[in-house]
Amino acid sequence: MKIIKGKKCDWEMIIGLEVHAQVISNSKLFSGASAKTYDSLPNTQVSLFDVAMPGMLPLLNQYCISQAVKTGLALSCKINNYSAFDRKNYFYPDLPSGYQITQFYYPIATDGKVVLEESNDKEVRITRIHLEQDAGKSIHEYGKTYVDFNRAGVALMEIVSEPDLRSTDEVAEYLKKLRMILRFIGTCDGDMEKGSFRCDANVSVRPLGSDKLGIRSEIKNLNSIRYVVQAIEYEANKQVMALENGEELIQNTLLFDVILGETRVIRNKEDAHDYRYFPDPDLFSLEIDDQYISEVKLSLPELPMQKRDRYIRDFKLNKYDADILVADRDVAAYFEEVVQKHDAKLAASWIVCDLFARLNKLGISINESAVKAGDMIQLLDLIVDKTISGKIAKQVFAIMFESGKSPISIVNEYGLKQLDDSDSVSMIVENVLENNKDKVLQYKQGKEKLFGYFVGQVMKETQGKANPELVNSIIKEKLQE
């Protein structure tokens, strides 16, 4: 809980979130038009139904139902055997029919939860998950408004939480956790920049210790977690200031101005009766039987929290590494391929530290990396069988990442095989000790830290190729003579 210090009393935030998650599907919710619209030219992925041409009827995409059921199960929801679609009536230029098909009365899933482990295992209740159409997109340029209907009719899952959140830290954790789950089960790509994971935040404040809910404002269409946090912080503090000045709050719908960092009113908040909901007469209700729910449940992959716990339990990974590896489904798959051949801690170290450092620097995903799982396995093979040292492996990896070449070919091309010949290493050690007689004497007089100096000089002479264990062994032997 985050307390807002007021002049008259302390206040707490009451926050509920409505997340609009675009369903991963080839086609739209009620038409055959492509749902892959982000990079398309305006109004090129549009059917007659999407733009409300007279006589066009909706045809339900059953795959979207499966995706919504899968999401509900992953969020511990009750999947309702009966579900139905309704019309939400309002006028806006990017909504050509004058209504949105949604699920107001009978949503597809209810009573779920998301557990926030970093907030003392707090449970944030999921009120409902329902399917609905996305609207088109209004583009305002040069004093004119243009409408792109590509997005109109794309399937959305609206995931509504109870007002259980009490700080922006909890909000950020909730959104990250929810997005991770949806990505992992393959129902939403969670790309906020592209608008496929958007958030409306309902914000109110009340005196600390009160159980009465205050007048809330809804901040619409927030498309980054950073903006969600900034908008909520600003709005909550604005409400506290108004209440302490004796002002009466009005239920409003707001937008967040990311340049000014402040919220502004776009309209008074509507209630349900303002939208005149009624059952859509063109669509049958849904009967979702238990057998179907069981089949969808069987298709669920291992969830990230379960996978993380398994990594910690079975592979003895620390929580930090395990959390990173399960944050993305493709990263987890990469790790699991490597760990079939190599020690889990060794694999995790190379993926989390070395591979991720380079991926993050370039801002690319693991699927775009030149170092595939098979290449990583080969590199670790060379380390384990002592063909190369760990230090040389870093050089090999850097070349792999830049060139896409295999580690074996790089080792051969650059002559990087580890020097394992004891006679050759012994000669180099003798030369190093001969050239540093004063330091040898100091070592024998008790300055044992110089041992590392001798090792470093040998490695320098061999350009890092000498087997470190062999070098250590021979130096110890020579110093005892």
Swiss-Prot record:
**Top-level taxonomic group:** Bacteria
Task: Give its E.C. classification number.
Answer: 6.3.5.-
Q: Which reaction does it catalyse?
A: L-glutamyl-tRNA(Gln) + L-glutamine + ATP + H2O = L-glutaminyl-tRNA(Gln) + L-glutamate + ADP + phosphate + H(+); L-aspartyl-tRNA(Asn) + L-glutamine + ATP + H2O = L-asparaginyl-tRNA(Asn) + L-glutamate + ADP + phosphate + 2 H(+)
> What UniProt keywords are attached to this protein's entry?
ATP-binding, Ligase, Nucleotide-binding, Protein biosynthesis
Q: Is the keyword Signal assigned to this protein? A: no
GO biological process terms held by the UniProt record: glutaminyl-tRNAGln biosynthesis via transamidation; translation
Q: What is the top EC class of this enzyme, as a single word?
A: ligase
Task: State the Pfam families in the record.
Answer: GatB_N, GatB_Yqey
The protein's matches in InterPro entries, at most eight in alphabetical order, are given as: Asn/Gln-tRNA_amidoTrfase_suB/E (IPR017959), Asn/Gln-tRNA_Trfase_suB/E_cat (IPR006075), Asn/Gln_amidotransferase (IPR018027), Asn/Gln_tRNA_amidoTrase-B-like (IPR003789), GatB (IPR004413), GatB_C_1 (IPR042114), GatB_Yqey_C_2 (IPR023168), Gln-tRNA_amidoTrfase_suB_CS (IPR017958)
Give one GO term, molecular function aspect.
ATP binding
Member of which family? Belongs to the GatB/GatE family. GatB subfamily.
Assembly and partners?
Heterotrimer of A, B and C subunits.
- Job description of the protein: Allows the formation of correctly charged Asn-tRNA(Asn) or Gln-tRNA(Gln) through the transamidation of misacylated Asp-tRNA(Asn) or Glu-tRNA(Gln) in organisms which lack either or both of asparaginyl-tRNA or glutaminyl-tRNA synthetases. The reaction takes place in the presence of glutamine and ATP through an activated phospho-Asp-tRNA(Asn) or phospho-Glu-tRNA(Gln).
This protein's name: Aspartyl/glutamyl-tRNA(Asn/Gln) amidotransferase subunit B
